[in-house]
């Protein structure tokens, strides 16, 4: 276990006065329970740094007071909601963990204006369950239904299965209540004018770009305590969906309306796969569009069987032939709309020499349908080895995304061959097009590994840098691997010096550096001092032995 700094008596006493004795602790056993999360850790340690204390506020006013106490005593703090991955935890020693689990209310569901007002600890599955009672649905990012709805739209990034209909995570916040890094309160959009929560912009220039940009500040720029999020029509779905079991053992006790179906589409090439995506977007149809990964499918549902199948050359080749797979779903408002959309997708598939399987004829239809809409399957990426990382994933026109998938597959194969990653035939690319007609989206290259094999730590990091080198060399855009620790020092000068603007925002909003910025960016003065010392850990020659890289 890492050594830990414990908060001193005076600030602890002041925080205790705000929260009460039962809602703050510096007991090492309690603090240890917040350090368990190794996923996407900045270091290669199995634990993240243990917090100096854990505080559990219940109101915005209590959050403000905690933040002001931290500023007064020059203590850093980090807020988390549901705590998926290490972004919500401290990135260094001596940080107070603000655990927002007591702020867990769905305050309002506005059926007419189609939005919900939530606090930080409301997870996506909770909001979806309540929204469905009103014939509505929410966007759930690929990380799964366990994630915080507020955190995913204010502080991180993400796309979910329904992104063609419900958009990208960062496009879903409306009015926001924001405790700034110094403890002052700022309401963004209409709540700032006392006009409700239906809009996140104005009057005047919007602050949403400063608040989150593309990737969010991951807790490095204060604390978000309330947020209105968009809701979307979810036509003809029962208000409650009874079932038994969980995940792959799900046994539904309901029947879907005939206006809902999902399909497997198999194409002969990436070119046909891409053309189908563009045609779907141009036709303005669909509720789900996403690449299916046959290599990962067996790993998620049956990891032991996958090892046997992939060790059999004949079976491996058969499975590989289904690589160019699209998952597509329709949710029609009426019988006529459903019939129209199904007619269109059949024509698109035929014109691109592809085949389509109607999953409604299979006994697993309801279970798989629910797994997609609930976004439960991505969480199963932990099954084969207990951990994974992701790379590529630039949000670009879909043809560029497919190019990332091709290159990412070749790079990942090298690291499968050397034992870094679990063999999934290098086919674990996930993503789709966003927002219907836009035809932009992302495809990220997910790599699963066994954390019990520590000797792969170095090559895992090397892989992330290799994929980033590829995005630079081939002008593929700013991908998910570009968000890793200190990548802004590399990518910033290549992209309009965005890192300088971000660090100036950090310094202006957080002059004391109180909001832990380990997963964000340091203040401008600190950043400038460190820029000259930065050396890339991995050089571009890491790509030299990637087979057929330029094909």
Model-predicted regions and their roles:
Residues 241-243, 253-268, 324-326, 382-405:
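Short glycine-/aliphatic-rich beta-strand segments at the starts of folded cytosolic domains
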Residues 107-109, 118-120, 125-268, 546-551:
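FAD-binding subdomain of flavoenzyme oxidoreductases
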Residues 212, 228, 239-248, 257-268, ...:
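C-terminal cap/substrate-recognition region of VAO/PCMH-type FAD-linked oxidoreductases
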